[in-house]
Amino acid sequence: MAAPRHHHLALAVALALLVVTAAAADEGGPRGRRVLVLVDDLAVRSSHSAFFASLQGRGFDLDFRLADDPKLSLHRYGQYLYDGLVLFAPSTPRFGGSVDQNSILEFIDAGHDMILAADSSASDLIRGIATECGVDFDEDPEAMVIDHINYAATDAEGDHTLIAGDDLIQSDVILGSKKIEAPVLFRGIGHAVNPSNSLVLKVLSASPSAYSANPKSKLASPPSLTGSAISLVSVMQARNNARVLISGSLDLFSNRFLKSGVQKAGSKIRHEKAGNEQFVTETSKWVFHERGHLKAVNVKHNKVGETNEPGMYRINDDLEYSVEIYEWSGTSWKPYVADDVQVQFYMMSPYVLKTLSTDKKGVFSTSFKVPDVYGVFQFKVEYQRLGYTGLSLSKQIPVRPYRHNEYERFITSAYPYYAASFSTMGAFFIFSFVYLYHK
């Protein structure tokens, strides 16, 4: 009977170690590593293997499923099974299992991330998901982006739908600090971004000479999408910091485009490798929060010269405020360095607005005097910067007036009133004395 006991004990210890190890692995990063990859053809797994290998090499656990799998589900027993979604199924008319457009949008609303790639065969389902994320693909189902000037030289005899794009967003947070030198190959459909929507950004835009139309037919009317208004790849960061990348080209992520050389039409410079591999690697790092993710910890406030946080301040108190902000580097949390983080001392409107100074070790701090107004105030930090997750910090604190025994015994500004009072009493005494005793 001893052997079974030892066997059960060893199994229990192994399971405990597995749980502890998994918890330790998840504790460090801002996001989990479970990613569902939906494809409409399992051949995509091999034709886009370099991109998937890049994700797996960075520690992501990919679960490949056909988009119409009848057992497909994003959650079970109220818990999501995945932390991210790669949707490489542009032609699928409906998803299998319990997955539909609403469940994917709920997945994003729950704070999860998604990469969506479409092409000229994009179904209404894929177009609908993209629309809900803030971008509108060309309504013409036969349309593709055409550029008779900025096309790849290998497409010289073709219909000029193989675009060599180099109009990239200027953001080291989204695209990395190393500049993408080579043009990015793109063949697919364009989309429009509402300029009033501050949550969506164009990452790769078409050139002014591009337009969206059916390459197999002559133009009967002016195209609805033209020039730089056409976005080839866009990203969206929701208010809950969920991130979405939408590409009008599935080929953008393919092995063929990632490993292909590129030469722009009319240019003498030939690049041995297109910018696709660097582009999709860097943008996927941003989408899955390997870069540009901030966290704030240890929010503190206290009176100057003290360390304990009071439950209430008095008007005109001198106080100190500090917060620690860190940025995820992909492997660890590093101190965030910036000179534009501000704190508000807020009641209906900001009474105090101060820029926080940093020690470049992650600590941001400032000091100020409590305004001569009592009520319920808030320390507020609202930090929104391009490419970074937003920080919204709020801490409530009441401010009271002076108590009766806390005022100065004699107020300097009241001396004229003191003099007036005593002079009035003196004059009345003299008047009374003269009136009573003078004959």
From Swiss-Prot:
Q: Which InterPro entries match?
A: DDOST_48_kDa_subunit, OST48_MD, OST48_N
Q: Which residues lie on this side of the membrane: Lumenal?
A: 25-416
Its pathway, per UniProt, is:
Protein modification; protein glycosylation
Q: What are the TM regions of this chain, as residue ranges?
A: 417-437
Which GO BP terms apply? protein N-linked glycosylation via asparagine
Return the GO cellular component terms, semicolon-separated: oligosaccharyltransferase complex
Q: Which UniProt keywords apply?
A: Endoplasmic reticulum, Membrane, Signal, Transmembrane, Transmembrane helix
Repeat as a keyword of this entry, yes or no, is no
What is the annotated signal peptide range for this record? 1-24
Highest taxon, organism lineage:
Eukaryota
Q: Which residues lie on this side of the membrane: Cytoplasmic?
A: 438-439
Give the UniProt subcellular location, in the record's own words.
Endoplasmic reticulum membrane
| Description of how the protein assembles with itself and partners | Component of the oligosaccharyltransferase (OST) complex.
Q: What biological function has been recorded for the protein in this entry?
A: Subunit of the oligosaccharyl transferase (OST) complex that catalyzes the initial transfer of a defined glycan (Glc(3)Man(9)GlcNAc(2) in eukaryotes) from the lipid carrier dolichol-pyrophosphate to an asparagine residue within an Asn-X-Ser/Thr consensus motif in nascent polypeptide chains, the first step in protein N-glycosylation. N-glycosylation occurs cotranslationally and the complex associates with the Sec61 complex at the channel-forming translocon complex that mediates protein translocation across the endoplasmic reticulum (ER). All subunits are required for a maximal enzyme activity.
Q: Which family does it belong to?
A: Belongs to the DDOST 48 kDa subunit family.
Q: What is this protein called?
A: Dolichyl-diphosphooligosaccharide--protein glycosyltransferase 48 kDa subunit
> Source gene?
OST48
